[in-house]
């Protein structure tokens, strides 16, 4: 059984490898791998059953096309739209009764793992009835804009506040290449103060564009 993940940032890649990824494809919002890129990855993984985690809605089509073009291996595309559900998706892999591979829990992964991404606006716009100015910091959730404002830390906190609920147990924070370790650690400490009953994890994601990628589960 093999595991291919699309990742962006050295830290994100390291985490994927630690979780058992056999092959990483560089991707992200501005670097969308092609069908050929996914096919090359499939060729490099020596397994009959291979799970592919696109981790971006724009890459799911390419992954599905690569699956359809592959005849000698069983390719299972898990339609993850962001990286955190892809991390947790690996825990749902198991062997089928016939020795093949099955994926149990795709719906559960998407239901229980919420993702938030904090970035900046490149132009003036209006989304989800929110006025956004060029340079504003935005917190984006699974279903739209959660927070808009001026400060990265403050908007990240607002984004997480909007994501947590009574079932939340873990908050995982992945800080990007434009965030210092000190700033990320300070954010983690504030989260621990605000949510003392939750496990708070701070990781160096190294991703560009997004100051923070957050998962809440």
Feature annotation, model-predicted:
Residues 1-217:
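N-terminal loops that bind phosphate or other acidic moieties
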């Amino acid at each position: 059984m093999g595991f291919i993940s699309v990742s962006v940032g050295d830290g994100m890649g390291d985490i994927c490898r630690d979780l058992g990824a056999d092959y990483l494809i560089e991707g992200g919002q501005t670097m969308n791998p092609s069908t050929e890129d996914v096919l090359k990855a499939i060729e490099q993984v020596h397994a009959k059953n291979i799970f592919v985690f696109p981790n971006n809605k724009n890459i799911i089509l390419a992954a599905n096309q690569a699956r359809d073009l592959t005849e000698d291996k069983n390719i299972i595309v898990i339609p993850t739209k962001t990286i955190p559900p892809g991390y947790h998706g690996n825990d749902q892999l198991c062997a089928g009764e016939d020795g093949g591979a099955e994926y149990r829990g795709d719906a559960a992964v998407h239901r229980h793992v919420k993702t938030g991404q904090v970035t900046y606006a490149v132009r003036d716009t209006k989304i989800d009835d929110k006025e956004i100015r060029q340079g504003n910091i935005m917190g984006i959730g699974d279903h739209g804009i959660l927070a808009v404002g001026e400060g990265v830390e403050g908007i990240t906190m607002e984004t997480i506040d909007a994501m947590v609920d009574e079932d939340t147990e873990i908050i995982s924070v992945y800080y990007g290449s434009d965030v210092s370790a000190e700033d990320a650690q300070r954010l983690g400490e504030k989260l621990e103060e605000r949510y003392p009953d939750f496990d708070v994890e701070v990781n160096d994601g190294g991703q560009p564009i997004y100051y923070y990628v957050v998962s809440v589960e």
